[in-house]
């Protein structure tokens, strides 16, 4: 069982990797779908971007963000399977877990506006307050998935869980959020350098890296929440 090991930064990352190794199909298939959809319209628009193309890009980006929230809540379901000792998750099992996660996605999406977008703006303006907010609210998605709270209550509950464990959450769940986005952009740059294509090359590089990093980020968040919830009971 995952809770047998005391919570620490290294143990959380190690357990997140263990879940991915145990369920590679369940971890990677949804991530590949999300990773490939991410910024595809942006990278494939050539020349000057007009208003219609900007709208399409914005809508697709919003849809990709919606899919990311699905993946984070889905990761919570898969973590539960690992906690129960399930040996493998089939393709049908993946679809089942996605269906299980989908009802809480709208609530999680609303909470994410505060939990992710506001800290990003704050980081742009002033680094420390943004990282502080990002860490305090980093556990909102698993809180909504498992405790069935509304957006505001989930943010408050996340802050309660983080209290006294700020460094642990900062170096796991908060770092995972930053790592996922930074790695995706780095992959796009690498794709451009390797292929010399600012369309399909950047898209391919970003998609591959996002597909690999996203599961680690999501499961690290889920495992961190699980440990802190157990310790608070």
What are the language-model segments listed below?
Residues 1-233:
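Hydrophobic alpha-helical membrane segments
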């Amino acid at each position: 069982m995952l809770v047998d090991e005391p919570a620490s930064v290294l143990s959380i990352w190690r357990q997140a990797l263990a879940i991915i190794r145990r369920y590679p199909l369940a971890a990677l298939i949804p991530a590949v779908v999300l990773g490939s959809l991410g910024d595809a319209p942006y990278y494939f628009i050539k020349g000057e971007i007009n208003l219609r193309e900007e709208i399409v890009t914005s809508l697709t980006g919003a849809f990709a963000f919606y899919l990311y929230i699905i993946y984070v809540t889905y990761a919570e379901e898969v973590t539960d399977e690992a906690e129960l000792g399930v040996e493998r998750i089939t393709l049908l099992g993946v679809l089942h877990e996605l269906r299980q996660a989908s009802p809480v996605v709208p609530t999680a999406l609303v909470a994410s506006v505060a939990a992710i977008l506001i800290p990003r703006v704050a980081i742009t303006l002033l680094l420390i307050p943004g990282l502080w907010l990002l860490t305090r609210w980093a556990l909102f998605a698993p809180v909504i998935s498992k405790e069935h709270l509304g957006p505001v209550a989930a943010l408050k509950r996340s802050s309660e869980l983080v209290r006294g464990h700020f460094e642990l959450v900062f170096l796991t769940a908060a770092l995972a959020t930053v790592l996922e986005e930074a790695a995706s952009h780095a992959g796009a740059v690498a794709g451009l350098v390797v292929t010399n294509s600012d369309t399909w090359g950047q898209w391919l590089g970003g998609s591959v890296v996002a597909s690999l990093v996203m599961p680690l980020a999501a499961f690290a968040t889920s495992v961190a929440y699980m440990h802190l919830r157990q310790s608070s009971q």
